[in-house]
Structure formats: structure tokens, C-alpha cells
């Protein structure tokens, strides 16, 4: 089986470099410093999150990874309108982050079929980039509620930003 196309590898490499830019440095064995706290968290439907895709100059830029909504406005040069990773914003892009992919088919919350390596990459980027660098502003409704509107029993209150987040899925 052939490896990924050279163009796709270049996009993945560029994504890794872009995500690593500005990472806080931590000593050996130290966890990255959590991002500064922002406004209180809220619940976002897919439609509400789509309003924060970087298209409006006066709006913050939000994206979700693993159902956690981050304010990535401080990375506007990467996530703003016309920026290289704008495709990740305004939605839960968990699969795209795991696969280091900007393919529209990968810009979804669905992690079905991801390899162990992709899941490990997802956890690493989630912790070392997003949780360390960007404020949590909310959660996707899909993470808190089931399709029928009933509570998602897998959601844990300790996932709230004022607690130390220890277990993400």
C-alpha cells in the first residue's frame, strides 16, 4: 500500500510545525502550563459553533477538539479568514487533528476507525497545544447531550475548566 501523497505529507508537516509554534516550554517531566482562563464556558450546537469560523473580523475564532471548544483567536495568523488552518475552525475538527488532515471529509468529531497512532497523536496535540495554549470557552452539545437530548453519561463534571482535566474520553 502506498504512503500518503507528497502534497498531503507536506500539509501534515506544515500543520505540525504551525501547531508547535509558540508552545510554552516545560521542564522535563513537567506538564504544559494551562491557558489563561477566559469567560465562563457554555454549550455550543454545531450551528452556533459555525458562527465562530473566523469569517467575521469582530468575532472570536473558535474550534473544537474532542468536544472541547477552544478560543484560538490568539492564533489568528493560523486560524483566521484565509489562513492555512481556517478549515479547522467553526466546528469540531477532532478527526482532522488526529490525522493531521485538512481534507473536508476529516473535519468532523467522528473518531471511528482511527489508528492507535492517530489517537495518540490526537491526545498529544490536544494536551500540548490546545489545552496548553488556548482558553476553553465551552463544549459541543454532542459531548454533553445524546442525539435524543438526554444527558451523555460519559461527560464528567471534572472536565470543566476550573478542575484539572484528567480524563478526556
UniProtKB/Swiss-Prot annotation:
Compositionally biased residues, Basic and acidic residues: 155-169
A Pfam family the protein falls into: Cyt-b5
GO CC list: endomembrane system; endoplasmic reticulum; extracellular space; membrane; mitochondrion
Record bears the keyword DNA repair: no
Recorded GO MF terms: growth factor activity; metal ion binding
Span list, region Disordered: 148-169
Segment forming the signal sequence: 1-28
Record text about domains: The cytochrome b5 heme-binding domain was proven to bind heme, although it lacks the conserved iron-binding His residue at position 79.
Family: Belongs to the cytochrome b5 family. MAPR subfamily.
Subunit structure of this chain's protein: Interacts with PINK1 and PARK7.
Other facts: Non-classical progesterone receptors involved in extranuclear signaling are classified in 2 groups: the class II progestin and adipoQ receptor (PAQR) family (also called mPRs) (PAQR5, PAQR6, PAQR7, PAQR8 and PAQR9) and the b5-like heme/steroid-binding protein family (also called MAPRs) (PGRMC1, PGRMC2, NENF and CYB5D2).
Protein's name in the database: Neudesin
Species: Bos taurus (Bovine)
Amino acid at each position: 500500500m502506498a504512503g500518503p501523497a507528497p502534497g498531503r505529507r507536506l500539509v501534515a508537516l506544515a500543520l505540525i510545525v504551525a501547531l508547535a509554534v509558540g508552545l510554552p516550554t516545560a521542564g522535563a517531566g513537567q506538564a504544559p502550563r494551562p491557558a489563561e482562563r477566559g469567560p465562563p464556558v457554555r454549550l455550543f450546537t454545531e450551528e452556533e459553533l459555525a458562527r465562530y469560523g473566523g469569517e467575521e473580523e469582530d468575532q472570536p475564532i473558535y474550534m473544537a477538539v474532542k468536544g472541547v471548544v477552544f478560543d484560538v483567536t490568539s492564533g489568528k495568523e493560523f486560524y483566521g479568514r484565509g489562513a492555512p488552518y481556517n478549515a479547522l475552525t467553526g466546528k469540531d475538527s477532532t478527526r482532522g487533528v488526529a490525522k493531521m488532515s485538512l481534507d473536508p471529509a476529516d473535519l468532523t468529531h467522528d473518531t471511528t476507525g482511527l489508528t492507535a497512532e492517530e489517537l495518540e497523536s490526537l491526545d498529544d496535540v490536544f494536551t500540548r497545544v490546545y489545552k496548553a495554549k488556548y482558553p476553553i470557552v465551552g463544549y459541543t452539545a454532542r459531548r454533553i447531550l445524546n442525539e435524543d437530548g438526554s444527558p451523555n453519561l460519559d461527560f464528567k463534571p471534572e472536565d470543566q475548566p476550573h478542575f484539572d482535566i484528567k480524563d478526556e474520553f
